């Protein structure tokens, strides 16, 4: 996922007094020479350059290689489920994040200044923000789809186009909400002599409301929707599991049990829900520190110290980590469960109805296309 950069405002002497952040470029935190208690440190682009480049290269390799493996895995499957579709969309978004956000940030670290024309500056910033929104909205779409799969399973089976509609809406909103970036950002020579792709505000007071709106559109509103969706899903699963245990314990008619079992939530769906929740938790862990830091910083609630600058370097890199972690989560959940072939037939003859049902669900679960 894309991360951000931070813009400093200056006093009459050109000394940076404020560090404002904006989630518009992957793992970017820009600050300028700041003086605190007689100590001076320089621009973010020239500070910790080696360490930042090593971190960015590692993130880039893991993001591109990991998501390429995921895309190849989903492409070669004969049976494409709706969950596979969403996994593919998430991998595509993360891959573009690596190419558009992390790679351009690596180039930027090498050059220090922004060397490309103003048009390139605006286009790059626009694409970075599009991916920022898309990464979040794809997760919202996934949560809505899982909600329908568990709470309204019959409508879910009849609505195959819903997944594609959700993704189209997610990307459309991402492109729409990112349009202001084309106007706000441009190539600019800063007071310290650096040439950067920067926000062209009439006044620094515009920065706080802009970042507040972005924070709500990118993080807080989507996170609220996701939390509500999965809260209902977990509650539904818990209720159905309790009902299932009660019915099965009192069930003696095989046909009746079989009929009832068809209305239950399969372990394949349960595993898909677990995968989705872990993906969401990774998103929260990677993005929460950034947005909390960003809000506190924009409302001047953080002290102007060197420690804050060091903290920003670490925190602003966390969102990019999300795109590298997602493929690892997929690999963990897509591991297959094998059964000894020679023992299957003999075991089938002595299995109870419940054991056969559970084993059938495990066989479904072991197939990657059902994840």
Swiss-Prot record:
CDD domains: 7tmA_NPSR. Glycans are attached at residues 4, 13. It is found in: Cell membrane. GO terms for molecular function: neuropeptide receptor activity; vasopressin receptor activity. The keyword Cell membrane applies. InterPro entries: GPCR_Rhodpsn, GPCR_Rhodpsn_7TM, NPS_rcpt, Vasoprsn_rcpt. The chain crosses the membrane at residues 53-73, 83-103, 124-144, 165-185, 213-233, 276-296, 313-333. It is a multi-pass membrane protein. Disulfide bonds join 121-197. Residues 74-82, 145-164, 234-275, 334-371 are cytoplasmic. GO terms for biological process: neuropeptide signaling pathway; positive regulation of release of sequestered calcium ion into cytosol. Keywords: Cell membrane, Disulfide bond, G-protein coupled receptor, Glycoprotein, Membrane, Neuropeptide, Receptor, Transducer, Transmembrane, Transmembrane helix. Residues 1-52, 104-123, 186-212, 297-312 are extracellular. Coiled coil: none annotated. GO terms for cellular component: plasma membrane. SUPFAM superfamilies: Family A G protein-coupled receptor-like. Its main location: membrane. Belongs to the G-protein coupled receptor 1 family. Vasopressin/oxytocin receptor subfamily. G-protein coupled receptor for neuropeptide S (NPS). Promotes mobilization of intracellular Ca(2+) stores. Inhibits cell growth in response to NPS binding. Involved in pathogenesis of asthma and other IgE-mediated diseases. This is Neuropeptide S receptor. It comes from Macaca mulatta. The gene is NPSR1.
